[in-house]
From Swiss-Prot:
Function: Acts as a chaperone.
Record region (Disordered): 597-635
Single Gene Ontology MF annotation: ATP binding
CDD domains registered for this protein in UniProt: ASKHA_NBD_HSP70_HSPA9
Gene, per the UniProt record: dnaK
Induction: By stress conditions e.g. heat shock.
Native organism: Zymomonas mobilis subsp. mobilis (strain ATCC 31821 / ZM4 / CP4)
Upper taxonomic lineage: Bacteria, Pseudomonadati, Pseudomonadota, Alphaproteobacteria, Sphingomonadales
Biased composition (Basic and acidic residues): 604-618
Family to which the UniProt record says this protein belongs: Belongs to the heat shock protein 70 family.
Name this polypeptide is given: Chaperone protein DnaK
Keyword Nucleotide-binding included in the entry's annotation: yes
Length: 635
């Protein structure tokens, strides 16, 4: 069995780790960084860029550069939060064929699972490059408050990327694993996870290798992206007041504002003030306009105060569900890049009445925890038991549109529960089972996960047929539902696929597309390497010919020039094999050139060596005689 890797698929950055010598190790990517921007771009040449290369060209290619796609995964296009995001990003969010929110880039529509799969492929390649072997199994993290549709979409992304996802693990739980792996004493901890796009809070009890989640809560649309948006809105408003121009209508300006906002936010974690300086941000009839604005830490804290306060409501709910008070928490573990912000730490400290634990790297700890879980599944990590929970209540719609809970939130998973229901009308021969997830009392106010029909019920008065509905939640938090007519034994079962979601056919097509992209990427890389090698050899050989001039035999010179011309012709095309073949042929001829040069030098040395030796010997004799005469004279 090959290595199982742990991947933190983040909104802003992603990270991959693996177990080595009993400890999780974060793997550096090709650019030498330990985290990779979760950004995918498509150039006008249809080239796909992932990570730092994609981020570098975002300003000049904003419409085709996709970031923060995790906020769209498993979401419907008509979802109010999707609508809000549509106005804030420079790329296009469109309605997928299944009604989900998709993105448009490079003239093509992509599902969020596909874009996430491209990022996962990059993580997979990073691990394979380090390990020197193929990797096809992974543990992937998701926000604890992700619903079933979002978890399933993340699992689909893994499949599209060519990975078997052994486990979907909650991010705060993964962080707790990394934090508590070497701690055996019993502790109650809170994991406060404020990342790039989501917020989670989990309360856990840790002791003797058992990690038991007591409660979890969160907000899947609250994170660093929202902090950036506040700064962008502030800068745009200030500029509009001064110049009368609305920068939010200009996609290029919006992307520049976003990058400046993120930079300012990071700088204000260590500095009291920072200057945003964006020359030539736009222009009007009077000429070019520049944006120059100084932002203080106090100003930033004022802008985002409501966002930080929003994190406290889920914290209070999680504590109440766990049956503990803030004072009962032994350690508060801070996770996610946004927890570096001094104001966030201050608010958490005031709420819990203790200094938060900052001994873990907030950007890497989740991937490390995923690697530990991978080690547990592989059998490399012993005596660790992870007991996670389902974040939201699950149930079905019953008479009057009421949401009837079958499994309450914060139930330890995996779990299974059955309940018997009946028909609402006389002689009803079919029932529709509509499955919902959420905490509201009416079904319509919760998230519809899916529905299916149980048909062939024998005619009977209402209330007589006995229909047993069974909910089964696996360790990934993914739901299976079945309905069985106890009278006839007829059964209908579904693995919940969101009312949108990707079908098996969609996934298979996307797997093939991803493989094609991988093949295209490989071809581009091989072509670039071949052209570099060919170009370099042509340059070296031509320089040698120039330096040697008439010293080269005419026949050899003609042969070398012909080989150089053949490589130059091949370099104009895209055929890797042809370029390599002609480069190799030039290499053989260039060796003859080097050999001829060496033989020529050797011949020249032999021709000049003899007279010099004789002259040197003669000089010695004269010196000796001269010395002797001198001595005699002195006598």
């Amino acid at each position: 069995m090959g290595k199982v890797i742990g991947i933190d698929l983040g909104t802003t950055n992603s990270c991959v780790a693996v177990m080595e010598g009993g400890q999780p190790k974060v793997i550096e990517n090709a650019e030498g960084a330990r985290t990779t921007p979760s950004i995918v771009a498509f150039t006008k040449d249809s080239e796909r860029l992932i990570g730092q290369p994609a981020k570098r060209q975002a300003v000049t290619n904003s419409e085709n550069t996709i970031f923060a796609v995790k906020r769209l995964i498993g979401r419907r296009f008509d979802d109010p939060v999707t609508k809000r995001d549509t106005e804030l990003v420079p790329y296009h969010i469109v309605r997928g064929s299944n009604g989900d929110a998709w993105v448009k880039a490079g003239g093509q529509d992509y599902s969020p699972s596909q874009i996430s799969a491209f990022i996962l492929q990059k993580m997979k390649e990073t691990a394979e490059s380090y390990l020197g072997e193929t990797v096809d199994q992974a543990v992937i993290t998701v926000p604890a408050y992700f619903n079933d549709a979002q978890r399933q979409a993340t699992k689909d992304a893994g499949k599209i990327a060519g990975l078997e996802v052994l486990r979907i693990i909650n991010e705060p739980t993964a962080a707790a694993l990394a934090y508590g792996l070497d701690k055996n004493d019993g502790k109650t901890i809170a994991v406060y996870d404020l990342g790039g796009g989501t917020f989670d809070i989990s309360i856990l009890e840790i002791g003797d290798g058992v990690f038991e989640v007591k409660a979890t809560n969160g907000d899947t649309f609250l994170g660093g992206e929202d902090f950036d948006t506040k700064i962008v809105s502030y800068l745009a408003e200030e500029f509009k007041k001064a110049e009368g121009i609305d920068l939010t209508k200009d996609r290029l300006a919006l992307q520049r504002l976003k990058e400046a906002a993120e930079k300012a936010k990071i700088e204000l974690s260590s500095a009291q003030t920072t200057e945003v300086n964006l020359p030539f941000i736009t222009a009007d009839a009077t000429g070019p306009k520049h944006l120059v604005k100084t932002i203080s830490r106090a100003e930033l804290e004022r802008l985002v105060a409501d966002l930080i306060d929003r994190t406290l409501e889920p914290v209070k709910k999680a504590l109440a569900d766990a049956g503990v008070k803030a004072s009962d928490i032994d350690d508060v573990v801070m996770v996610g890049g946004m927890t570096r912000m001094p104001k966030v730490r201050q608010v958490v400290k005031e709420f819990f009445g203790k200094e938060p634990h900052t001994g873990v790297n907030p950007d890497e700890v989740v991937a490390m925890g995923a690697a530990i879980q991978a080690g547990v599944l592989q059998g490399d990590v012993k005596d660790v038991l992870l007991l996670d929970v389902t974040p939201l209540s699950l149930g079905i719609e019953t008479l009057g549109g009421v949401f009837t809970r079958m499994i309450d939130r914060n139930t330890t998973i995996p779990t299974k529960k059955s309940q018997v229901y009946s028909t609402a009308e006389d002689n009803q021969n079919a029932v529709t089972i509509r499955v919902f997830q959420g905490e509201r009392e009416m079904a319509a106010d919760n998230k519809l996960l899916g529905q299916f029909d149980l048909v062939g019920i024998p005619p009977a008065p209402r209330g007589v047929p006995q229909i047993e509905v069974t909910f089964d939640i696996d360790a990934n938090g993914i739901v299976n539902v079945s309905a069985k007519d106890k009278g006839t034994g007829k059964e209908q079962q579904i693995r919940i696929q969101a009312s949108g979601g990707l079908s098996e056919g969609d996934i298979d097509k996307m797997v093939k597309d991803a493989e094609k992209f991988a093949a295209d990427d490989k071809h581009r890389r091989e072509l670039a390497e071949a052209k570099n090698n060919g170009d370099s050899l042509v340059h070296t050989t031509e320089r040698q010919l120039t330096e040697l001039g008439d010293k080269v035999d005419a026949a050899l010179k003609t042969e070398v020039e012909a080989a150089v011309a053949a490589v130059k012709t091949a370099l104009e095309g895209e055929d890797v094999a042809q370029i390599n073949e002609k480069t190799q042929a030039l290499g053989q001829v260039a060796m003859k050139l080097g050999q001829a040069l060496y033989e020529q030098d050797q011949a020249n040395n032999e021709r000049h060596d003899t007279p010099e030796t004789e002259k040197a010997e003669g000089d010695n004799v004269v010196d000796a005689e001269f010395q002797e005469i001198d001595d005699q004279d002195k006598k």
